[in-house]
Regions:
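Acidic/His metal-coordination segments adjacent to aromatic residues that form catalytic metal sites
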Residues: 122-135, 212-214
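Catalytic cores of Mg2+-dependent Asp-rich isoprenoid enzymes
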Residues: 2-101, 110-121, 140-149, 160-175, ...
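Cofactor-binding active-site loop characterized by glycine-rich and histidine/acidic residues
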Residues: 107
């Protein structure tokens, strides 16, 4: 039986506490941007955020864990089954799944966006080109905007907090920036998230990118994506009044988008070789400033 303390914060002794602790440790190591941002949320609500973000990380890294699409499909189907089984299904042994299902129950989270996130990640398993810019924005919405929206529901403790349009723009800006940061790894394993319509406009093919010979066309294509990310940032800023203070920690990691974009515009940036990151101090400073301004 879940104790009251465990129900609130996931901190009581027992399997659920261990599951939430696993999520926090995983996030601290694998996704420090979201982890540090989550520390600005009320302490009792952080475990729910950690469960959501750890789930997103687990699903996102399926491609890295398999060498063929079929085993990846099996792993994603396992997550679908976990979500569809809910409380009525057998208790999963996976700590992230345990924490996620408890978070869904405690905060009455809808299953559809979680399932949609899993479904969107099927694209990652294959080396198909991203067909168009609208397709890329849709992918970003399902994998990133939906996650922000779910985090808002946790922070609002299951009530509708508003801010859905803001979450949409925030998620797209964050996802586009993340994909550009991951460009070296994606290109090395044959994945191209730059939309085919943008590549065609700049005279680049998928084959050019995976063979490391994109040239100026790749630079122009990435420049277009940076401009698009900033458009979504501006739209988010225009909608800031629609975001209640209680749910702003869900948006906090988006404060790191502009520093990342600026790092990509520095002299010497090479999309195939440059690793775009922030020092822990720079990350803390950017998030602290954004939290104070919220």
């Amino acid at each position: 039986m879940t104790t009251e303390t465990e129900h609130r914060a996931g901190t009581a002794p027992g399997p659920l506490s261990q599951a939430y602790a696993h999520c926090a440790a995983l996030l601290r190591e694998a996704d420090p941007d979201r982890y540090v941002a989550s520390l600005y949320a009320p302490e009792a609500l952080r475990p729910g955020l950690h469960a959501l973000y750890a789930f997103s990380h687990e699903v996102a890294r399926v491609r890295e864990q398999v060498s063929e699409p079929l085993p990846g499909e099996v792993r994603l189907q396992w997550w679908r089954d976990v979500l569809e089984g809910g409380e009525g299904g057998p208790a999963p042994a996976h700590p992230v799944a345990q924490a996620l299902l408890d978070t869904v129950r405690r905060f009455r989270l809808p299953i559809a966006p979680l399932s949609g996130l899993v479904e969107a990640r099927v694209f990652d398993l294959y080396d198909d080109p991203m067909p168009s810019l609208p397709d890329l924005e849709g992918y970003a919405g399902e994998t990133s905007s939906a996650l922000i929206r779910l985090a808002c529901l946790v922070l609002a403790q299951g009530r509708d907090p508003g801010g859905a349009a803001a979450a949409g723009h925030a998620g797209v800006a964050y996802a586009l920036t993340g994909l550009m940061r991951a460009f070296p790894w994606h290109a090395a394993r044959g994945q191209v998230y730059l939309p085919a319509d943008i590549l065609a406009r700049n005279g680049v093919t998928r084959e050019d990118i995976v063979r490391g010979r994109g040239g100026p066309g790749v630079d122009y294509s990435l420049k277009e994506l940076r401009a698009l990310a900033r458009i979504h940032l501006r739209k988010l800023n225009d909608l800031s009044a629609t975001v209640p203070a209680a749910i702003r920690p869900a948006f906090l990691a988006v404060a790191l988008v502009e520093p990342y974009l600026k790092a990509m515009e520095r002299r010497g940036y090479d999309p195939y070789r440059s690793i775009i990151t922030l020092s822990p101090l720079r990350r803390q400073w950017a998030l602290w400033r954004a939290a104070r301004a919220a």
